[in-house]
Curated annotation (Swiss-Prot):
InterPro entries recorded: aa-tRNA-synth_I_CS (IPR001412), Arg-tRNA-ligase (IPR001278), Arg-tRNA-synth_N (IPR005148), Arg-tRNA-synth_N_sf (IPR036695), ArgRS_core (IPR035684), DALR_anticod-bd (IPR008909), Rossmann-like_a/b/a_fold (IPR014729), tRNAsynth_Ia_anticodon-bd (IPR009080)
Name this protein carries in UniProt: Arginine--tRNA ligase
Catalyzed reaction equations: tRNA(Arg) + L-arginine + ATP = L-arginyl-tRNA(Arg) + AMP + diphosphate
Entry annotated with the keyword Membrane: no
Underlying gene: argS
Gene Ontology biological process terms in this record: arginyl-tRNA aminoacylation
Length: 577
């Protein structure tokens, strides 16, 4: 039950009725009409801008239109306690208690689907996220994007969309060659006591390579490690496979499971790069040309070479992009073109890419080529996961993958746990940098958002245990009378915002809205709980050690929303803390 959508429908029906009898003119579109959450300083439950939308078409001020509508709206609904106009033309509505009685009955009966946005057209989504090079375990920079992609998937699944989660394995090119060489030298170090060439800056010096090397030795799939050239092909496959095992384990410990891993090597060897480029050629979007020196590059040192270029400027990019170098080898971008063509061939309605902050500049070229191949400007949506700053002992902790002293996902989980990692990483918009403070995430206070929300659920669970009920079971209470006051209704109004939160999180792909909402709801509940220390009427367990049915239903509704939100975020709701 989305009270905002229900009331919007009522208002639209009313103004169309007024238009039909000649009392009111309508604009070309009513899409601008909304029913929303009023500011906290207004004593009302919902607010609508309908008068402002109708003002121009009727050549009257919004306040005049509002004054015409308020009596008509009130006459249409006996559950309205008060209705008023406020500048510049809002109509504010406050409901009688009976409205909230019906509201809580409705969502208690249909709690599993409460919040689902039935207005959204159901689609098939392919979400690609993480896609870190398979050259070692995941670090904190990957962690935020991984959680972002996973929770966006959960939100879309909650709204009944068909979602596939994919990891693109960049297992082709020089980085993989250098990674495999690093493993080779670690194997030589173990078998023949040869010193690892640490001075070679192209190699990966991390200690995790020792574990990968030992596993490859134990597999007995390569028997001789005399020269790298003799074993490079088989060793590359084994090294990438072992690295992916580490990555999949990292993701599993974060609560993330991908549906598919797509290999860049497979894309290249299946000649998909050439096929994708041929499609662009057919559209006359490829030509041979030269690229000028990039900004900041010395023109004197830049050598212009004839290359195969994609006309990405036709789609708003700042320059055309190279697909094939002068030596006829494909660029990294060409492989990406082929991969996205591969995605398009699988007939998804919408593609979503979660990119790290270092790939933000890559967005325009890849959205351009997807538009070129699909003819749909909105086919691909890219979300950027900004940097994470780790704070330890009051100081920033820096990481460097090349030096091998970076903080891994495993380090983070070992320090604060899976739940804290997921919740805190999601607690701010992905568009801004995040400070991850190790001290705060361990506190048992309102400064720790995860603890505050989990404690809300645990407190409610304690009341259910007191009356020998399992909070996870449905309540079979049919005969109950409501006696809610303004303090309870304040919480119910917050509960009423849940569908709006889900709608915004889904349409804008902004999952941080979920933990922010859960924290606000929990804060309202904790405040109410604390009132019971002074006010007997606010206590859930009365002097006779019993709880009224209306309070029990009230608690159940709160706990259902908390549980639903925490499931989307992917964290536990403990019944005891």
């Amino acid at each position: 039950m989305n009270i905002f959508d229900l009331y919007l429908d009522k208002i639209i029906i009313l103004i169309k009725k007024l238009n039909k009898d000649g009392s009111l003119e309508l604009p070309e579109s009513l899409n601008g009409v909304n029913v929303d959450i009023p500011p906290s300083n207004f004593d009302c439950d919902i607010s609508t801008n309908v008068a402002m939308v109708l003002s121009k078409a009727n050549k009257k001020s919004p306040i005049d239109i509002a004054n015409i509508l308020i009596e008509l709206i009130k006459n249409e609904d006996e559950k309205i306690e008060s209705i008023s106009a406020a500048k510049p033309g809002f109509i504010n509505i406050k409901f009688k208690t009976i409205y909230w009685n019906n509201f809580i009955k409705s969502i208690n009966q249909n709690h599993k689907d409460y919040g689902v946005n039935n207005k959204e057209k159901k689609q098939k989504y392919l979400i690609e996220f993480v896609s870190a090079n398979p050259t070692g375990p995941l670090h904190v920079g990957h962690c935020r994007g991984a959680i972002l992609g996973d929770v966006i998937s959960n939100i879309l699944i909650f709204n009944k969309h068909d979602v596939s989660k994919e990891y693109y394995v960049n297992d082709y090119g020089n980085q993989i060659l250098n990674f495999t060489k690093s493993v080779f030298f670690r194997i030589r170090e173990i078998l023949f006591n040869e010193k690892f060439p640490i001075e070679n800056s192209d190699l990966y010096p991390g200690d995790y390579l020792v574990g990968i090397a030992k596993n490859i030795i134990k597999s007995n799939k390569v028997l001789k490690f005399d020269k790298f050239e003799n074993v490079s092909k088989e060793l590359t496959l084994l090294s990438v496979s072992e690295s992916l095992k580490l990555i999949k384990n990292n993701l599993s410990n974060l609560g993330i499971v991908h549906d598919r891993f797509t290999s860049e090597t497979d894309i290249v060897l299946n000649n998909e790069v050439q096929k994708a480029i041929d499609k662009l050629k057919e559209k006359k979007l490829v030509y041979s040309g030269k690229i000028k020196a990039p900004k900041g590059e010395d023109d004197e040192n830049w050598v212009e070479r004839e290359q195969l270029l994609f006309k990405s400027t036709d789609f708003g990019d700042d320059k055309d992009r190279a697909l094939q170098k002068s030596d006829k080898s494909w660029t990294y971008f060409a492989s990406d073109v082929a991969y996205h063509d591969n995605k398009l061939n699988r007939n998804y309605d919408t593609l979503i890419n979660i990119l790290g902050a270092d790939h933000a500049g890559y967005i325009k070229r890849i959205t351009s080529v997807v538009e070129a191949l699909s003819g749909d400007k909105k086919k691909l949506i890219c979300k950027v996961s900004q940097l994470v700053k780790l704070i330890k002992d009051g100081k920033p902790f820096k990481m460097s993958k090349r030096k091998g002293d970076y903080i891994t996902v495993e380090d983070l989980i070992a320090e604060v746990g899976k739940d804290a990692t997921r919740f805190i990483m999601l607690n701010r918009s992905s568009d801004v940098e995040l400070d991850f403070d190790f001290t705060k995430v361990k506190e048992k206070s309102k400064d720790n958002p995860l603890y505050y929300v989990q404690y809300c659920y645990a407190r409610i669970s304690s009341v259910f245990r007191h009356v020998n009920l399992n909070i996870e079971n449905d309540l079979n209470i049919k005969d109950y009378e409501f006696a809610y006051t303004g303090d309870e209704i304040k919480i119910l109004k917050k509960i009423a915002e849940w569908p709006k939160c889900i709608e915004a999180a889904s349409l804008r792909l902004e999952p941080h809205r979920i933990p922010v909402y859960l924290y606000e709801l929990s804060s309202e509940f904790h405040s109410y709980w604390n009132m019971g220390k002074e006010d007997q009427s606010k206590r859930f367990i009365n002097e006779q050690k019993k709880i009224s049915n209306d309070k029990l239903v009230f608690l159940k509704v709160i706990s259902n929303v908390i549980k639903s939100g925490m499931d989307i975020v992917g964290v536990d709701t403990p019944q005891k803390m």
